[in-house]
């Protein structure tokens, strides 16, 4: 992931745009994704990432976290984590991410990208290997391993 993509992902979490991700912002972002994490666990996550000790995560700390995750993913992708991420997008549980489901998740995250069905259709087309107009788990997994999801948000 290049610095532009990293900034884009960081901004998804940095809701107020002050250059720092707080526990509250992290909590809100996860809730928007349908992931509930107790506040004490979120605090622990931030403490592990927070190198400068200010209680927040800045872009450099976020970048280091991302590098760590990507190195671990290259060695051994956590299948459970990958399925959990897929299920966030596959809202009806049918095993496919549709244009409508992608739009709903991106909207819930408050992203500028994917506001129209046409934008979401283009994003799906970028990773839809079998051409059925939806993303199955294997296509999603390949996309995530290659880091293509965040580049498709450009």
From Swiss-Prot:
Ca(2+) 1 binds at residues 14, 16, 18, 20, 25. InterPro entries: EF-hand-dom_pair, EF_Hand_1_Ca_BS, EF_hand_dom, EF_hand_pair_protein_CML-like. Ca(2+) 4 binds at residues 128, 130, 132, 134, 139. Residues 1-36, 37-72, 77-112, 115-150 form the EF-hand domain. It comes from the Eukaryota. Ca(2+) 2 binds at residues 50, 52, 54, 56, 61. Gene3D superfamilies: EF-hand (1.10.238.10). This is Calmodulin-like protein 6. The gene is CML6. Pfam families: EF-hand_7 (PF13499). Belongs to the calmodulin family. It comes from Arabidopsis thaliana. GO terms for molecular function: calcium ion binding. PANTHER family: EF-HAND CALCIUM-BINDING DOMAIN CONTAINING PROTEIN. Keywords: Calcium, Metal-binding, Repeat. Ca(2+) 3 binds at residues 90, 92, 94, 101. Potential calcium sensor. One of its GO terms (cellular component) is cytoplasm.
């Amino acid at each position: 992931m290049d610095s532009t993509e990293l900034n884009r992902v960081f901004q998804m979490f940095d809701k107020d745009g002050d250059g720092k991700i707080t526990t509250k912002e992290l909590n809100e972002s996860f809730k928007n994704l349908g992931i509930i994490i107790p506040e004490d666990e979120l605090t622990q996550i931030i403490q592990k990432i927070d190198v400068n000790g200010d209680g927040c995560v800045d872009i450099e700390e976020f970048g280091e976290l991302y590098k760590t995750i990507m190195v671990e993913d290259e060695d051994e992708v956590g299948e459970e984590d990958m399925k959990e991420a897929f299920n966030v997008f596959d809202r009806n549980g049918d095993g496919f991410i549709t244009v409508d489901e992608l739009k709903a998740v991106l909207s819930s995250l408050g992203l500028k990208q994917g506001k129209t069905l046409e934008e979401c259709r283009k994003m799906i087309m970028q990773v839809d290997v079998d051409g059925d107009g939806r993303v199955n788990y294997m296509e999603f997994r390949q996309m995530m391993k290659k880091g293509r999801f965040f580049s498709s948000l450009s």
